[in-house]
C-alpha cells in the first residue's frame, strides 16, 4: 500500500483548494496518510480526512496521547525520542524522521519560512523520497524543475534571511572586491556607507534599503537578517567606492 507523509506550517489556518484536491486523490487511491499532531497543517489535514470519513490515517506523536486527534478511528503511533534532549523542536524531529522513513513520498504545505517544514523537505531530498510542495505565497504546487535543494534554499532564505556570518561566508567565496572578512567588519561597512545608523543599542536602516533586510525584535533585543540582494549591494558599492 502506498503511503504519504503530510506535513506543513503551523501558521497556515485554512487548506488551499489545490491541497484539498490532492487530498481527494489520496482518498480515491486509498493511500495511507501519516500526519503529526501539531496545530496548523497537521490538524487541518486530520479534520479534512475525518470529515470525509477516511480512516486510513496514522497520527504520529511523541506524547502518551496525541495533542490533536480528529477521529477515534485514526491509528496512533507513538514515536520514541531521546528524552535527554531539552529542545521541544529536537524532540519532535524524531517523529518527523520516522514519518519520512516509513512513507513512500512527502507532501509539504509550506509558508516558505517554517523551519520544521524546511527540514522535512531537506530530509525528503536526502532520502530520495518523492516530493510534492504546495507553496502558499504563489498559491500552487512547485513545478518539477523548481523542486531542487537550491531552489528550496532560496525560498527559505528569501523569507527568513541570512545571518551575518552566512553573508560573510558568501562574500569570502564570491568575486566581490571588499575587505569584509568578519561579522564586525560587515556591520562597520554598512555604517560607513550610511545604510545603517547606530542609535544607542539599536541599528536603524536607511528607508531606501529596508527591502534588503529582515528585522526581528524580541523581548527588547534586535536581530537583523540579510536578504540575498545584500551581496549585490555590497558588490556595487565595493567596486565604485563609497556613495557621496
Regions found by a protein language model. Give the residues of each.
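Short, Lys/Arg-enriched, disordered terminal segments
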Residues: 1-2, 147, 242-244
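Short, hydrophobic/glycine-enriched beta-strand segments
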Residues: 2-10, 36
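Acidic/glycine-enriched connector segments
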Residues: 12-146
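Structural motif
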Residues: 3, 57-58, 212-213
Amino acid at each position: 500500500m502506498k503511503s504519504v507523509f503530510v506535513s506543513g506550517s503551523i501558521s497556515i489556518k485554512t487548506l488551499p483548494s489545490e491541497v484539498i484536491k490532492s487530498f481527494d486523490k489520496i482518498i480515491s487511491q486509498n493511500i495511507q496518510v501519516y500526519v503529526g499532531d501539531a496545530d496548523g497543517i497537521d490538524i487541518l489535514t486530520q479534520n479534512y480526512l475525518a470529515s470525509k470519513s477516511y480512516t486510513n490515517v496514522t497520527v504520529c506523536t511523541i506524547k502518551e496521547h496525541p495533542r490533536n486527534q480528529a477521529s477515534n478511528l485514526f491509528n496512533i503511533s507513538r514515536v520514541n525520542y531521546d528524552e535527554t534532549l531539552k529542545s521541544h523542536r529536537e524532540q519532535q524531529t524524531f517523529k518527523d524522521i520516522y514519518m519520512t522513513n516509513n512513507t513512500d513520498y512527502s507532501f509539504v504545505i509550506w509558508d516558505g519560512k517554517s523551519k520544521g517544514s524546511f527540514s522535512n523537505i531537506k530530509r525528503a531530498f536526502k532520502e530520495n523520497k518523492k516530493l510534492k510542495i504546495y507553496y502558499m505565497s504563489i498559491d500552487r504546487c512547485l513545478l518539477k524543475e523548481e523542486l531542487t535543494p537550491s531552489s528550496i534554499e532560496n525560498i527559505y532564505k528569501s523569507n527568513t534571511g541570512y545571518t551575518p556570518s552566512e553573508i560573510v561566508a558568501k562574500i569570502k567565496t564570491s568575486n566581490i572586491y571588499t575587505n569584509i572578512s568578519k561579522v564586525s567588519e560587515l556591520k562597520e561597512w554598512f555604517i560607513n556607507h550610511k545604510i545603517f545608523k547606530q542609535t544607542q543599542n539599536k541599528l536603524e536602516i536607511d528607508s531606501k534599503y529596508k527591502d534588503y533586510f529582515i528585522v526581528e525584535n524580541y523581548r527588547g533585543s534586535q536581530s537583523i537578517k540579510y536578504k540575498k540582494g545584500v551581496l549585490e549591494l555590497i558588490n556595487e558599492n565595493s567596486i565604485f567606492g563609497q556613495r557621496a
